[in-house]
Amino acid sequence: MDTPLLSDRERLIQALEASDQRRREHRADRIEWLALYEVTPPVVIGRPETMHMLREAREVFVDGHFVAALMMAMSFIEHTVVEELQLLGHVSGSPTFAQAIERAKEKKTFPPDWLLRAKTLSLRRNPFAHLKQGDHPHTLGARVRHEKKHPRVIVETDAKDAIELMYNFFVATLREDA
């Protein structure tokens, strides 16, 4: 019996269905993990860029794109820290993230342990955003050698820490409309 030839589109759909099936359990695990930290008020109004980063950090994390989740979560945190400092009159303009962290520490804008975690995660994010020498201590290769863990485990752990911290900053800066 002759099997009908499938179009490229039909083969693509079949491949996507198989991929979805293989990844479904892991995505469900990540959604359940996110539920421990995620806060979703009925209405949130904020800067469109910042709100998109919050949503995209969640989405790429669920899909297992851990470097992207780290990048998005840290971008959200940077926006949030700087915006809070601006709203409180502690800075004007757009300071660097390192400057914003230091200013937030001075002004006690956020808990010091959050700011320390944000600084650490920023250093871990930087080799993905800015090319570093191969032996730089924050590169993934150097961390794999030092921590003796698989790269995927390292970036997943970083992503989880960044996502959790992102939701901490999100909740801390929620305001009721007056």
Predicted regions: what is each one?
Residues P112-A178:
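Charge-enriched, short contiguous segments at helix-coil
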Residues I13-E17, M51-L54, M74, A118, ...:
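Generic structural concept
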Residues G64, T80-S92, F128, K132-D135:
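Amphipathic alpha-helical interaction segments
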Residues E38-T40, K107, K148:
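A short, mixed-charge helix-start or loop-turn motif at secondary-structure junctions
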Residues L85-L123, A142:
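Short, charged amphipathic alpha-helical segments flanked by flexible coils
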Residues A18-R22, K107, A172, E176:
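Surface-exposed polar/charged interaction patches
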Residues A57-R58, V62-Q86:
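Short, hydrophobic, well-ordered secondary-structure elements
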Residues M1-H65:
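Charged alpha-helical initiation segments
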